[in-house]
Swiss-Prot record:
Binding positions for Cd(2+) 4 per the UniProt entry: 45, 59, 65, 73
Family statement: Belongs to the metallothionein superfamily. Type 2 family.
UniProt keyword annotations, A-Z: Acetylation, Cadmium, Metal-binding, Metal-thiolate cluster
Residues reported to bind Cd(2+) 3: 26, 30, 32, 41
Sequence positions bearing N-acetylserine: 2
Binding site for Cd(2+) 1: 15, 19, 32, 36
Up-regulation conditions: By cadmium.
Transmembrane segments: none
The protein, known as: Metallothionein
Domain of life, source organism: Eukaryota
Binding site for Cd(2+) 5: 47, 53, 55, 59
Length: 75
């Protein structure tokens, strides 16, 4: 049985209080919400607000980062 804290294997992020921060391996396809307790699920925008993205706000992955082509979201 796959580790529920490892969404790279399961394809779903089931991170919760029961998943240790170091045990949840979230991949690029893992769209974790703000209520996700796993540190590995958190991503931040590494772009400037001039590009249309307020860094660290409502950015849960590359798909939600509304910036120029040089923008990237990273863990």
């Amino acid at each position: 049985m796959s580790d529920p804290c490892n969404c790279i294997e399961t394809g779903t992020c089931a991170c919760s209080d029961s998943c240790p921060a170091t045990g949840c391996k979230c991949g690029p396809g893992c769209k974790c919400g703000d209520d996700c307790k796993c540190a590995g699920c958190k991503v931040k925008c590494s772009c400037t607000s001039e590009g249309g993205c307020k860094c660290g706000e409502k950015c849960t992955g590359p798909a939600t980062c509304k910036c120029g082509s040089g923008c990237s979201c990273k863990k």
